[in-house]
């Protein structure tokens, strides 16, 4: 990381102990030698007040279509299947599961997960509590139905945190438990958001960030991001400097 935009909240490293205590109920069990699935994936989608109805639909439909895409399904089948859950997040107490844990291993189960996403209704809007979103995603991983070789949180958003615990503290605590956090930064309103996500949000083994200029690019980006996460490698997607996509 070449530079930082600075911390969004007053330095409070002493508070990390308290945050670790808060995370204790969400402790992630290390993956067993004989994992039942290649990956347990939580998709954490921003629905804060900066995301309008059209942008909300672009995100949800983009994810649904990705799980109906033949390339994504082929990748999932090649690793023996994944467990996936999608949640929405905005303010401190506003995180909601849209599509609960689903074992996706073929086209039929991919379509079933897509149907759950399309059946969901917007749960909230509000401020941008990235730290609380990561806490909720960590709690969801604790309840994953199968042992997984990798545990990944894929968080997407269009703004910096403006309330709640510092994202980097929550990230560090989750990374210490073996959870990788990847990001998709939407630069429509904050062109520097990629730097913030790189410094404050993503982390862990093989972590990467993909950035797009606007919500119209989301569907293509999430498909490529899923392919990278499923195969446990970062794609070169056109201009991919810490994850840039034109």
Predicted features and spans:
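VWA/integrin I-like adhesion module and closely mimicked acidic/polar interface patches used
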Residues: 74, 159-200
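Exposed acidic/Ser/Thr-rich ligand/metal-binding surfaces
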Residues: 125-176, 227, 246
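Von Willebrand factor
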Residues: 36-100, 103-104, 111-156, 182-193, ...
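Bacterial N-terminal signal peptides
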Residues: 14-27
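Short beta-strand-loop
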Residues: 79-116, 193-199
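N-terminal secretory signal peptides that target proteins for export/translocation
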Residues: 1-11
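Von Willebrand factor A/integrin I-like adhesion domains
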Residues: 189-236
């Amino acid at each position: 990381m070449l530079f930082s935009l600075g911390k969004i909240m007053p330095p409070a490293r002493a508070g990390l102990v308290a945050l670790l205590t808060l995370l204790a109920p969400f402790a992630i069990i290390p993956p067993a030698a004989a994992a039942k699935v290649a990956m347990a994936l939580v998709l954490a989608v921003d629905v804060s007040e900066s995301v309008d109805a059209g942008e909300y639909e672009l995100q949800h439909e983009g994810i649904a279509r990705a799980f109906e895409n033949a390339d994504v399904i082929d990748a999932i089948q090649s690793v023996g299947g994944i467990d996936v859950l999608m949640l929405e997040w905005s303010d401190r107490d506003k995180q909601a599961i849209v599509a609960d844990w689903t074992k996706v291993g073929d086209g039929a189960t991919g379509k079933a997960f897509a149907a759950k996403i399309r059946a969901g209704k917007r749960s909230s809007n509000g401020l941008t509590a990235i730290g609380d979103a990561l806490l909720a995603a960590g709690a969801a991983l604790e309840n994953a139905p199968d042992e997984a070789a990798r545990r990944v949180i894929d968080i997407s958003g269009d703004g910096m945190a403006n309330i709640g615990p510092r994202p980097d503290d929550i990230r560090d605590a989750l990374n210490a438990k073996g959870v990788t956090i990847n990001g998709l930064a939407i630069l429509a309103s904050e062109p520097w958001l990629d730097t913030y996500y790189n410094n404050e949000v993503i982390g862990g083994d093989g972590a990467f960030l993909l950035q797009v200029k606007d919500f119209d690019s989301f569907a293509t980006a999430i498909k490529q991001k899923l392919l990278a996460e499923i195969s446990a490698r970062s794609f070169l997607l056109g201009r991919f400097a810490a994850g840039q996509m034109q």
